[in-house]
Each structure stands twice: as C-alpha cells, then as structure tokens.
Amino acid sequence: MSRIHMIRHGRPASTWGDADPDPGLDAVGSEQARAVAQALLALPPSERPTRVVSSPLRRCRETAQPLADALGVAVQIDPRVGEIPTPAALSAEARPGWLRLAFQGTWNEIQGDLDYVAWTREVAQGVASYPGAAVFSHFVALNAAVSAATGGEVVAAFRPDHVSVTVFDLVDGDLILVEKGREASTQVL
C-alpha cells in the first residue's frame, strides 16, 4: 500500500472569464502554497510525499513548487491531472455556464466532446501512477478522482477548498479514498 496526497491549487490571481486563461497564484495563494508544503513535510515519514506531480496549469505548478523545492525534486507535469476538457466549440465566455450545469449533474450527463465517465478513470489512473506523491490539481479533477475511487456518479461530490489535501491509498493499483480534503465555504463559479 502506498499513500497519495491530491491537493487543489492555491488561490489564483484571476478566475473564470477574466483576461488571463492561465493565471498564477495571488499573494494569498502563494502563502497557501508555502503552508501546504509545510503541512505535508510535517507528516510522519511513512506518509510524507517524496515526489511532486502537477497539472500543466500555472496555478498548480506554482502551488507545487514550494514542496518540490523543500524535497529537492523536480515537479513532474502530467496533463491527466489537469482541468476538465472543455468542448472544442465552447467559447471561454461560455465555459463558466457549462461548468455550473455540469456541477449540478452526474458525469454521464455532461455535454461535451468526450466520455466524461472515462475521463474520471483517466484522472484516477494518472493519480494512481504516482505512489508516494503529492499531486497538485483542480476542483473538478479532485472530484473525478474521488468519484473513480468511490464509484460515485455526482460531479460535485465535494467542494475542495484551495490547498485542501485529499488522501488516497493505492491498493493493487486502485485508489482507495482515505479522507476528503477541507471543503470550501465559497462557490467555485
């Protein structure tokens, strides 16, 4: 058995619909990144991450960097733990509405270019391929991994807060949910 910590990125400098499609962290988010690194480093040695993996997006990479620096490792980038793919025909302005609708339903009800149930499995496989890692990701991808681990169908099964840490054990190649991370008190969209 191996433990995997999946962390939502820190607070970004901008949100959906703003001018920057790939924002980094704001000052609060940068402090959150340092704090979550310290919290992970304070875990017992048998639970402490030894590898750092991130979504390709800047807010995740910047959240991951303090832990990688402290561990003396490079951040491994894996698009499988990235944001939920938006339908190709959807404009950036329409994405928040599409996500709000998706959050109200199940994975198989999401309208788009791909099979989103299969996408949840791809996210889970991505996470599971990094035993002993801290995986920095996104709200929807965290929900995808939790759904895959629990067999859940609801898209927004929980509302992970910025830098909340969701814990999985890896048993025979499968993710087993140990603990969901702290939930947000504010809306994502």
Regions found by a protein language model. Give the residues of each.
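Acidic, low-complexity terminal tails and accessory targeting/binding regions
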Residues: 1, 69, 73-77, 83-97, ...
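Active-site-proximal alpha-helix that buttresses catalytic centers in soluble enzyme cores
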Residues: 2-77, 101-110
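Generic beta-sheet signal
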Residues: 4, 50, 129-140
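Histidine-centered active-site/metal-ligand motif
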Residues: 9, 138, 184-186
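Short, active-site-adjacent cap segments at secondary-structure transitions
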Residues: 13, 59-61, 84-85, 141-143
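Conserved anionic group-binding/transfer micro-motifs
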Residues: 29-33, 116-120, 135
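Short beta->alpha linker loops
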Residues: 55-59, 137-140, 160-163
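Internal catalytic-core helix/loop-beta-alpha segment
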Residues: 101-130
